[in-house]
Amino acid sequence: MFCLPQQESTAPTTCTGSASTQDMDSGYGDGLQGECLRKPDQTQPKLYGVGDPTATFSSDSSCLSSRGRVIKWFWDSAEEGYRTYHMDEYDEDKNPSGIINLGTSENKLCFDLLSWRLTQGDMLHVEPSLLQYPDWRGHLFLREEVAKFLSFYCKSPAPLKPENVVVLNGCASLFSALATVLCEAGEALLIPTPYYGAITQHIYLYGNVRLAYVYLDSKVTGLNTRPFQLTVEKLEMVLQGVSSEGVKVKGLILINPQNPLGDVYSPEELQDFLRFAMRHKLHVIMDEVYMLSVFEESLGYRSVLSLERLPDPQRTHVMWATSKDFGMSGLRFGVLYTENQHVATAVASLCRYHGLSGLVQHQMAQLLRDHDWISQVYLPENHARLKAAHTYVSEELRALGIPFVSRGAGFFIWVDLRKYLCKGTFEEEALLWRQFLDNKVLLSSGKTFECKEPGWFRVVFSDKENRLRLGMQRMRQVLEGQSQVVEDASPCHAQEPQSQPR
């Protein structure tokens, strides 16, 4: 986690950060300490939690540029858990004592369905145009299928247009591209926390764009409130605080369904947030990468593209990918839908570096046009498997007396382990994360999502039954041991967990 020492601020809910960690990630790296490459710019405002990201690097420790050292630092410090997992990955036959990964948000439940569909005859096609340079927005045949797909599954009130579609190799590239074309270096985007921490890296490494954190907490203040609830009032407070510190805010990032909370924004909330952005002339980046992974129908999920009227369509940009909903995180495919042709053209220009091969574009077009298979075979079975896995992990957590937040969207449960911390600090959270890893189960810690309350963890449940059972057994072993440690330590007062919806 890259967060420089915080300084006093008159806006305690505001933190502008310049880096974070990856989703696979749950890692607590050691961080690099060394001589400053150069002194921080004295003219830069003393922002809450912000400084010169190159200041921790030795001037003679590497052949890399200062920018290259920052990039390497991310790799060294932010992915320890994921690298450790890959060096000791669990295999039922070859490595039964290896690490179970309940930290990376991937859907591993439907490989049988996907492998069948991706090996059908219509997927195997080669023609000259697929081997030549394409339109950088993506081949027209693919953009037409994407527009039809989003129109149908987002339930848009009018058909979406292929000229508003840009395709590229995943949402990480899309975040990088959007931040670069929408923001000047040093400007910021608002984002509610906890959030998918890799976004900070995506927008910072290329565009030098930062995030202004809208810190949310687990406290429930009334009948109509819920844990970690975003409101317009909180957005206004952080926007004013960051602006008063001399940082220009250019937009708002919303993840819906939410990662790591497994919750969704209501249509009314979406409209409120969009109107807030319009009042302040902010772009809104809507990340809807889990839109087809809502397995509780009672949630009533609505895509922003389903709204009858967008307050500011020229500043509303929607992203989606196959990584989550179709369990294809290794097949890089992401989509931008925007009515702003200046934004679409600028992002398309960057697709020279983030484009898709013609063969992959053909395969994706074939997949997305197969509404019968998607609606009648894949989605019902995927939702059933997600729900069964979610039910199992939820019951295990209840048996342990562990509160959690999860309303039936995505692949994860946001788990409250604060009572297992001897002290309510992120150092204690890191020690607990390390205990899990030492006991061969990888989780994602709350710090990697910029959660303001130490002791929260994200548990991914979208895996096969045997791995889930073993992973939960290993979690239980750690927590039972930690309970004894907390009980024996004196004086030691664990923070009482607040009641959370189950």
From Swiss-Prot:
The modification N6-(pyridoxal phosphate)lysine is found at K324. Coiled coil: none annotated. InterPro entries: Aminotransferase_I/II_large, Ethylene_sulfur-biosynth, PyrdxlP-dep_Trfase, PyrdxlP-dep_Trfase_major, PyrdxlP-dep_Trfase_small. Substrate binds at E106. Belongs to the class-I pyridoxal-phosphate-dependent aminotransferase family. It comes from Mus musculus (Mouse). Does not catalyze the synthesis of 1-aminocyclopropane-1-carboxylate but is capable of catalyzing the deamination of L-vinylglycine. GO terms for molecular function: identical protein binding; pyridoxal phosphate binding. The gene is Accs. Residues 1-24 are annotated as: Disordered. This is 1-aminocyclopropane-1-carboxylate synthase-like protein 1. One of its GO terms (biological process) is biosynthetic process. Keywords: Pyridoxal phosphate.
